[in-house]
């Protein structure tokens, strides 16, 4: 995530503009997102590391797991949106997303559905990453905190996408 994000946060904010947002699994899922500055820092660390080029994969994130409910509340507040979070069971959200995707495919021009199964998966199930190996082998250190990243994203969103 970060300024210019076109993937997750803009879609979430588009739904949130209605004043309501479906809080899948009551927002209890814990996720660990990655600011674009940290992706760049990890790439630089990998290029400069003495680690052998053996094709290893490394987990990269901000290293700050947070419950979805808290992440959304912070994001909406920073973006100046008053949003009521409405708890929705996961299975109901998955089913509704499938219907939303089907209806979008049937519409002329196939507009993007407001709710997708991928989006439900992102906020409905815990997804955290252990960045220990990247820290130890590459010297990776996140350079942008979650708080700073959210603030930067919100400022950009308010001036460019809102």
Feature roles, as predicted:
Residues 12-17:
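C-terminal beta-strand-loop-alpha-helix "lid" module of Rossmann-like NAD(P)-dependent dehydrogenases
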Residues 39, 43, 60, 71, ...:
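Non-catalytic, hydrophobic alpha-helical segments
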Residues 2, 24-29, 56-65, 76-79, ...:
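Glycine-rich Rossmann NAD(P)(H)-binding loop
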Residues 46-113, 151-152:
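Mid/C-terminal beta-alpha module of Rossmann-like enzyme folds, strongest
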Residues 36, 96-141:
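Conserved C-terminal active-site "lid" loop/helix of NAD(P)H-dependent oxidoreductases
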Residues 31-37, 63-66, 129, 144:
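Residue-level signal for the nucleotide or nucleotide-sugar donor/cofactor binding architecture
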């Amino acid at each position: 995530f970060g300024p210019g994000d076109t993937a997750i946060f803009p879609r979430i904010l588009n739904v949130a503009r209605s004043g309501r947002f479906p809080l899948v699994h009551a927002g209890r899922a814990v996720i660990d997102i990655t600011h674009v500055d940290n992706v760049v820092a990890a790439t630089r660390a990998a290029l400069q590391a003495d680690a052998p080029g053996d094709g290893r994969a490394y987990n990269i994130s901000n290293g700050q797991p947070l419950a979805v409910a808290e992440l959304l509340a912070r994001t909406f507040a920073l973006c100046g949106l008053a949003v009521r979070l409405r708890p929705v069971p996961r299975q109901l959200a998955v089913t509704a997303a499938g219907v939303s995707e089907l209806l979008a495919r049937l519409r002329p021009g196939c507009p993007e559905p407001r709710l997708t199964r991928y989006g439900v998966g992102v906020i409905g199930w815990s997804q955290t990453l252990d960045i220990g190996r990247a820290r130890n082998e590459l010297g990776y250190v996140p350079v942008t905190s979650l708080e700073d990243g959210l603030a930067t994203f919100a400022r950009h969103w308010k001036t460019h996408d809102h």
